[in-house]
UniProtKB/Swiss-Prot annotation:
Keyword Iron belongs to the record: yes
Binding site for [4Fe-4S] cluster: C351, C414, C417
Gene3D superfamilies membership: Aconitase, domain 3 (3.30.499.10)
Keywords carried by this UniProt record: 4Fe-4S, Amino-acid biosynthesis, Branched-chain amino acid biosynthesis, Iron, Iron-sulfur, Leucine biosynthesis, Lyase, Metal-binding
Name of the protein in its database record: 3-isopropylmalate dehydratase large subunit
Similarity comment text for this entry: Belongs to the aconitase/IPM isomerase family. LeuC type 1 subfamily.
Entry's EC annotation: 4.2.1.33
GO molecular function list: 3-isopropylmalate dehydratase activity; 4 iron, 4 sulfur cluster binding; metal ion binding
Single GO biological process annotation from the record: L-leucine biosynthetic process
Textual note on the cofactor: Binds 1 [4Fe-4S] cluster per subunit.
Subunit field text: Heterodimer of LeuC and LeuD.
Reactions listed under catalytic activity: (2R,3S)-3-isopropylmalate = (2S)-2-isopropylmalate
UniProt gene name: leuC
Organism name: Acidovorax ebreus (strain TPSY) (Diaphorobacter sp. (strain TPSY))
HAMAP family registered for this protein in UniProt: LeuC_type1
Amino acid sequence: MGRTLYDKIFDEHVVHTEEDGTAVLYIDRHLVHEVTSPQAFEGLREAGRKVWRVSSIVATADHNTPTTGWERGYDGIADPISKEQIVTLDKNIQESGAAAFFPFLSKRQGIVHVIGPENGATLPGMTVVCGDSHTSTHGAFGALAHGIGTSEVEHVMATQTLLAKKAKNMLVQVNGKVAPGITAKDIVLAIIGKIGTAGGTGYTIEFAGEAIRDLSMEGRMTVCNMAIEAGARAGLVAVDDKTINYVKGRPLAPTGVEWDQAVAYWKTLHSDADAKFDAVVELNAAEIVPQVTWGTSPEMVLGIDAVVPDPDKEKDPSKRGAIERALTYMGLQPGKPMDDIFVDKVFIGSCTNSRIEDMREAAAVVKKLGQKVAKNIKLAMVVPGSGLVKEQAEREGLDAIFKAAGFEWREPGCSMCLAMNADRLEPGERCASTSNRNFEGRQGAGGRTHLVSPAMAAAAAIHGHFVDIRQFA
């Protein structure tokens, strides 16, 4: 019987299997940042161990890095704990070594899930881990990638392996072509809206179908990034020419004979025609409209042409209660049109949507509308995902488009995706955000988050409320 893409990668990395089915899995790439690594390095020191395979580590600072005040250097990091974590990462990597390290203030520094792929650290067929739940991003390359906890970070550093039980296989097939103006973010939000945030629990999801194949590598990264929000630990897309062309020539990619050998292997990284999946979900791409979350979970999402749901119409008591709690927190009334929801702040960035194509997508909307940020918008900020993205955007003049319209153009970092740095919402503030989580307090205590695509966020900044981006496509 044929094997799925997940089966192939998992099986080829099994070092040993216990009687209960637990596998010792070899890890090819370990991505490290400043938040989940300090305890791991300290644990190694206390045990008298060293990093087993230094060449597997690629490190950067991202969660705590400020997006302003870089001219002040490390003194620009206002929070002492944030500063300590960033300084500690510098010291730990200097002591242990790494295949590549992109420290705070360096040209290639950025969000770990942006700098990994752009530097060729993420390759097809790899097992990739990081102490961050959105490591699933790297599955876009046909790599088995998922987040791990701090104790597991130390385990991988010490042994280059991880204990894992094999997941079930789910195929999410998005058939046909999307309408103009529909993006990867809309696709993945529609998927989550269909299967729910627990739909992928216990599975690894392979994303397939014409609409997925049509996506660029950056679009595929957006989809795989949010596989975790569908309950899956990992998401995958089969390798094709787009994958190989993206990787070619990047700093950490193989070269010469090794490149040729790698490509030959990479071309086998797809599910066999007769592979069996434990679950199959299908979506019609033509039916996907611009998506906006209304509640406090990514599954609480609707099309821009819908209205806020009425809990009284929900028969399931637990679901009805969840809707009521979400509406109370979000300050929304049932029946309110989604395009009548006004926002206070706009955030374009995060490991979901901060790559150069996201910048172009948002800038194109701003340029087409030709107007300033709406007066009710307190802050509209654009945060590129890495120094290289920022540099490329500035070469293309995208920063000038944003700044002329009244957006703030920031330095790279995780920024307002999470309330771990200076960029955050105040209680009661409503944000159109291109990030991946709209949980209570995610962007700041009492903050209200609506997840959207970069184009939808840009349009909301100009209009002051959500609008149907298809009219500008």
